[in-house]
Amino acid sequence: MKKIASYYLMTLGLSSLTFGLLLGFYSFVMYGDMIIALFTAAIALLYGFVVYGLFAVPLQMKLQKKARTFNVMYLLIYSVVAFIAAFLFFVINEPASIAWTLQSYFYYMLSIAAAVIYWLWDSLILYKRTASGV
């Protein structure tokens, strides 16, 4: 059981780190300021850790009962959950922004990136786990 929990934590940590680095890089490209990029990366890492922990890890535990690596259906499920989580995050921060959120390319980019990142790390770590026989 401890071994399986370590795989969930590894997926959570690596996904959050990748998400933070991706948004930090995006911020650096958009604004050209390293301080803003580092701050964005740190905030995104924390945001990713909390949101992945609340939404993705329980879903991952449910999906791991029939463990399949690089399953496109899992990517679609993670995408739907990512869209819901990002929508809730945007609406909680700015309740009057529902129309803006749905029109924003950043909402779609953030949701798809979050889903793909988690799905990729989940599949890679699951592949490693099944190869080691755990």
UniProtKB/Swiss-Prot annotation:
GO terms for cellular component: plasma membrane. The keyword Ion transport does not apply. It is a multi-pass membrane protein. This is UPF0715 membrane protein YoaG. Belongs to the UPF0715 family. It comes from the Bacteria. It is found in: Cell membrane. Keywords: Cell membrane, Membrane, Transmembrane, Transmembrane helix. Its main location: membrane. The chain crosses the membrane at residues 9-29, 35-55, 72-92, 106-126. InterPro entries: UPF0715 (IPR031374). The lineage of its organism: Bacteria, Bacillati, Bacillota, Bacilli, Bacillales.
